[in-house]
């Protein structure tokens, strides 16, 4: 849309690795590279967990970085829990002129909360007041 309207802005899109099971994502990836959308940055929350199961029990999406590069994207990988790395990676976009950028942020779902960490069971679970308080306590928050 920006190119057609001759507007100069940068678009950021965030997806989870579980979403990348959908073919429309890969169609969009091919089109973005084909049209040289250097004003597009994709952030992938790569936590290895989809809504219904761990990614490896479904259709594997790894190796993500290699796939995005094969589609013509400039790629960086970071620790998605390191705020400094996140800021540095976002400040550096576009990674290559004339190519869309993919930032793969490796994370652990529910990090720091024992009953939610690294499990799909808390992907869309109900958070009661008690659960909320327990999570805050485990994170060391008041």
Language-model features: where?
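Glycine-rich ThDP/TPP pyrophosphate-binding loop and its adjacent helix/strand module
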Residues: 1-142
């Amino acid at each position: 849309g920006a190119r057609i309207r001759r507007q100069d802005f940068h678009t950021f899109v965030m997806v989870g690795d579980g979403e990348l099971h959908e073919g429309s994502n890969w169609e969009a990836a091919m089109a973005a590279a084909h049209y040289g959308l250097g004003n597009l940055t994709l952030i992938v929350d790569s936590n290895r967990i989809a809504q219904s199961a761990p990614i490896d029990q479904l259709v594997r999406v790894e190796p993500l970085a290699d796939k995005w590069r094969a589609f013509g994207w400039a790629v960086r990988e970071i620790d998605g829990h390191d705020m400094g790395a996140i800021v540095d990676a976002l400040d550096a976009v576009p990674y290559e002129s004339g190519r869309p950028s993919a930032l793969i942020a490796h994370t652990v779902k529910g990090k720091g909360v024992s009953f939610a960490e690294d499990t799909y069971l808390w992907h869309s679970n109900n958070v009661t007041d008690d659960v909320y308080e327990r999570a805050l306590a485990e994170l060391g928050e008041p």
